[in-house]
Amino acid sequence: MRKESFEFKYEVFESSDDLPEKDRALIEKARKVTEIAYAPYSEFKVGAVALLNTGQLVSGTNQENASYPVGLCAERALLATASTLHTNIPIDTMAIAYHNLNGESATPASTCGMCRQYISEYEERTKQPIRLLLSGMQGRVFVLEKAGQLLPLSFGSADLNG
């Protein structure tokens, strides 16, 4: 028996003001799009904006439903839109921001497990890692070079083929 471990590095910026202009603009767009999220139950609004390899932007927001399991996270809304409107176009960078109407929104929040799996398969399908920018409405920003770092033992299409 042997023990193994996973480790990954990510960058921490104290403010979006410290980011390169391109990343700062993407974070600001993600923060802005939280305004149109539909989150009447949790009041936890999430916005995501992706920069495609073509230079185009795609956005998504969380969409809650009174039947809680039916809701949709911002990341999956974004990826479904990108996949539909820009089939097989890789995503360079995805910025995700949240606005907690009931409290602070200054610490970056990570994606949920379902979204990690969804993003992982999108990376696999387009054969390109997706950079992630994670933030609240202000405060620190986390930058990950590839979203796959968040799901080191991912399940993918190869697992279905035996």
Predicted regions located by residue number:
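Short loop/turn motifs at secondary-structure junctions and domain boundaries
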Residues: A39-S42
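Helix-adjacent hinge/juxtasegments
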Residues: G55-M94
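C-terminal binding/interaction regions
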Residues: M1-I36, A80, H86-G162
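Short capping/connector residues at structural and topological boundaries
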Residues: V46, Q63, C73, F155-G156, ...
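Short beta-strand scaffold segments in enzyme catalytic cores
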Residues: K45-L52
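Short acidic-glycine loop/turn motifs at beta-strand connectors
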Residues: L52-Q56, G136-Q138
